[in-house]
Amino acid sequence: MNFLSRIISPVVIFIISIQFIFAIPEAFVYNHSTEQAFYFFESVTIDGQVVDADDWVGVFNGDVCVGARRWGECYGTSCDVPVMGYDNSEYTTGYMMPGGMPSFKIFDASESEYLDAVASEDIPWFNGSYEILDNLQNAVSGCTDADACNYDDTAN
């Protein structure tokens, strides 16, 4: 093997392996659109703990993924998550329409688990908007009626 081959082979292997380290979770694959909005989250938590850099936030319109971002791409600060809208192309069928309400999921990479998530505010989607939200947290089911006998103060 010549000198150049000894250098190029490890570099190619490294580049290919990097693609798999940060591969987007299967359920979070989406197409880009000319119609876009961004939802910025100050924090994202699972059971009250800040998510890891390898965890992902996904945005959905029904069961169609319309955007996603790996938390580590934001370097521990507020994170922008792109949310794509329908732009009259076949690639964006089922994407957000003006006034539609997106839903969110968190992919916990350490557990390989998708979790339903609840944003601190419900903000409808509009093309070109930039929304800032305090928090996104995994959904904790339970009774949210403070006067009920089975009230769960951790439920959302």
Which sequence ranges carry the predicted segments?
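Primarily marks secretory-pathway-exposed extracellular/lumenal segments that are disulfide-
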Residues: N2-N156
